[in-house]
């Protein structure tokens, strides 16, 4: 298969070396565990965290005479993913045996797909930025293919001083291997691609994307070249289980290869691993080619065939995906591209925002969700699923502001109370005397006292009207933030003789 270079060299992404500029070429092979209750070819459970070898059937253990039976739900999940990636769905695909020996691969081969995968070419649009002007750059990254395959088991080397144990709980679990084209040109692009892909999978409900549990991991192919030259020799960094680590591995590996080439050496095609503790890649073995695996069609499995009606039925039931949701937020709610991008980055955040925004001003709801809620969650190290403030509670805060019951400052205090103690926003405002002061007489008295106590500041404000804001701040402080800010501002300007 020939590899086509579709990207025009971009000087913004060049890496400066001692002898000139270099360009890094990146391709990603993402292994995403299919969200399914049972494995690809057996009825064994896929539940994470069970005791070793608790989720193992006779098929998973490769007992003699046991034959694989395809899990239809895994097939549907792969097709849904292909549709979400705007990819070609192949109506006929074939399962192959990929032959190699690992202690945790009991069959002595892995059932995968080689020449005829279930999903063909697709694409993902990633956004890079914002730059100093606040602009985003959209980049199209090609998808080469998506195929279904079995996961292997896990060798455990820390259970006994002189022996290794094997846990087959993951053996036979369905994986989607999603292979990008070599279209990525920086570690930032690679991280953006993985973030976007994970978001799409979560929206579709085809993979939970939990990299810390191993349900999504990446093999990272890296090579370097002079800008515009032919592709260089690539190295593959296996099983990187964090988006941040993927970025670090690419940065290190690109520098390593550039250093070798600038010293007159050559790059060996090899498989490497990333050590996150040292922030470096290390050689594991020479890189295999396809012929080393001796692929051939699995004689125990018929070709996988389905018609247009099968695909169309799945397409009809697809949820709204991140890009479409972002466009709707910008178009219908008037959000900025940046705010909409933040809100759709995770399905749970988008769902929370939509619950808050329903029947309310979308921009105000977005401001509270992004700045106050997500800010508090980040500070506390919590996820949106762990938020102590429900959409109904946050919506209640916004309603109280709109009704003029509380000021913006008091709303911040109310949010803190909800975060720490919970409760009903309206009841808290009532019981704690947090209602905004709208009585003009009470506000006027406070304004008069501040003006009388600061004659020097009065003269300055008359000479420079913008300084009237100082008086507004002092009145708000004197009233504990309860005064209506608009009423205070109008009274201050009136008392100082400043025209609106």
Swiss-Prot record:
One of its GO terms (molecular function) is glutaminyl-tRNA synthase (glutamine-hydrolyzing) activity. Pfam families: GatB_N, GatB_Yqey. It catalyses: L-glutamyl-tRNA(Gln) + L-glutamine + ATP + H2O = L-glutaminyl-tRNA(Gln) + L-glutamate + ADP + phosphate + H(+); L-aspartyl-tRNA(Asn) + L-glutamine + ATP + H2O = L-asparaginyl-tRNA(Asn) + L-glutamate + ADP + phosphate + 2 H(+). Keywords: ATP-binding, Ligase, Nucleotide-binding, Protein biosynthesis. SMART domains: GatB_Yqey (SM00845). Allows the formation of correctly charged Asn-tRNA(Asn) or Gln-tRNA(Gln) through the transamidation of misacylated Asp-tRNA(Asn) or Glu-tRNA(Gln) in organisms which lack either or both of asparaginyl-tRNA or glutaminyl-tRNA synthetases. The reaction takes place in the presence of glutamine and ATP through an activated phospho-Asp-tRNA(Asn) or phospho-Glu-tRNA(Gln). Heterotrimer of A, B and C subunits. HAMAP family: GatB. This is Aspartyl/glutamyl-tRNA(Asn/Gln) amidotransferase subunit B. It comes from Sinorhizobium fredii (strain NBRC 101917 / NGR234).
């Amino acid at each position: 298969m020939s590899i086509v270079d579709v990207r025009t060299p971009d000087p913004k992404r060049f890496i400066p070396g001692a002898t000139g500029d270099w360009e890094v070429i990146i391709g990603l092979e993402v292994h995403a565990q299919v969200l399914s209750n049972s494995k690809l070819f057996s009825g064994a459970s896929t539940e994470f965290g069970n005791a070793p070898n608790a989720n193992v059937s006779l098929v998973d253990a490769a007992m003699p005479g046991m034959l694989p039976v395809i899990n239809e739900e895994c097939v549907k999940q792969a097709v849904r993913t292909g549709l979400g990636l705007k990819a070609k769905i192949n109506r006929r695909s074939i399962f192959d045996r990929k032959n190699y020996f690992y202690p945790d691969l009991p069959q002595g081969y892995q059932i995968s797909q080689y020449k005829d995968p279930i999903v063909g070419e697709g694409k993902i649009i990633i956004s890079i930025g914002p730059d100093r002007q606040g602009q985003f750059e959209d980049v199209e990254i090609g998808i080469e293919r998506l195929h279904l395959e079995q996961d292997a088991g896990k060798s455990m080397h820390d259970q006994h001083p002189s022996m290794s144990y094997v846990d087959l709980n993951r053996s036979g679990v369905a994986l989607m291997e999603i292979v990008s084209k070599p279209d990525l040109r920086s570690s930032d692009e690679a991280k953006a691609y993985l973030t976007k892909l994970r978001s799409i999978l979560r929206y579709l409900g085809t993979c939970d994307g939990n990299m810390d549990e191993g349900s999504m991991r990446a093999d990272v192919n890296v090579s370097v070249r002079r800008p515009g030259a032919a592709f260089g020799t690539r190295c593959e960094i296996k099983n990187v289980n964090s988006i941040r680590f993927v970025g670090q591995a690419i940065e290190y590996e690109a520098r390593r290869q550039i250093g070798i080439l600038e010293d007159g050496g050559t790059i060996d095609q090899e498989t490497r691993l990333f050590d996150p503790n040292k922030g470096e890649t290390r050689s594991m073995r020479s890189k295999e080619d396809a012929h080393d695996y001796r692929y051939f069609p699995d004689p125990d499995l018929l070709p996988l065939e389905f018609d247009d009606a099968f695909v169309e039925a799945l397409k009809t039931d697809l949820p709204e995906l991140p890009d479409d949701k972002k466009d709707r937020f910008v178009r219908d709610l008037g959000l900025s591209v940046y705010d909409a991008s933040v809100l759709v980055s995770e399905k749970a955040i988008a769902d929370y925002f939509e619950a808050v925004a329903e029947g309310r001003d979308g921009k105000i709801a977005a401001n509270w969700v992004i700045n106050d809620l997500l800010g508090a969650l980040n500070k506390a190290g919590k996820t949106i699923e762990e938020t102590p403030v429900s959409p109904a509670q946050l919506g209640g805060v916004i309603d109280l502001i709109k009704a003029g019951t509380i000021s913006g400052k008091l709303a911040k205090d109310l949010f803190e109370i909800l975060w720490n103690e919970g409760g009903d926003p309206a009841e808290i405002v009532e019981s704690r005397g947090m209602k905004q002061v709208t009585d003009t007489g009470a506000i006027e008295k406070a304004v008069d006292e501040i003006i009388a106590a600061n004659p020097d500041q009065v003269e300055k404000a008359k000479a420079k009207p913008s300084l009237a804001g100082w008086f507004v701040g002092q009145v708000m402080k004197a009233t504990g933030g309860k005064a209506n800010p608009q009423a205070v501002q109008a009274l201050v300007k009136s008392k100082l003789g400043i025209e609106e």
